[in-house]
From Swiss-Prot:
Domain of life where this protein originates: Bacteria
InterPro entries: Ribosomal_bS18, Ribosomal_bS18_CS, Ribosomal_bS18_sf
Pfam families: Ribosomal_S18 (PF01084)
PANTHER family in UniProt: 30S RIBOSOMAL PROTEIN S18, SMALL RIBOSOMAL SUBUNIT PROTEIN BS18M
Functional description taken from the UniProt entry: Binds as a heterodimer with protein bS6 to the central domain of the 16S rRNA, where it helps stabilize the platform of the 30S subunit.
Stated name of the protein: Small ribosomal subunit protein bS18
GO CC, one annotated term: cytosolic small ribosomal subunit
Alphabetically ordered keywords of this record: Ribonucleoprotein, Ribosomal protein, RNA-binding, rRNA-binding
């Protein structure tokens, strides 16, 4: 049996996910630039919504890439 996934944000007592914390956000993005779903990471629904918003803001401000690389 697999271990139950726990939400890291709940355990750490995070109130709100910051879009400027790029290193933490990178852990929730695949190599291709997609947001990892909560069923894989174990993130609760509340924090998954905040995470998606923070990643989208960071992408818009060019702190994170939209995809892994650009083709010519």
């Amino acid at each position: 049996m697999s271990r139950r996934k726990v939400c890291r944000f709940t355990v750490d007592g995070v109130k709100e996910i910051d879009y400027k914390d790029v290193n933490k956000l990178k852990a929730y993005i695949t190599e291709t630039g997609k947001i990892v779903p909560s069923r894989v990471t174990g993130t609760s629904a509340k924090y998954q919504r905040q995470l998606a918003t923070a990643i989208k803001r960071a992408r818009f401000l060019a702190l994170l890439p939209y995809c892994d690389r650009h083709f010519n």
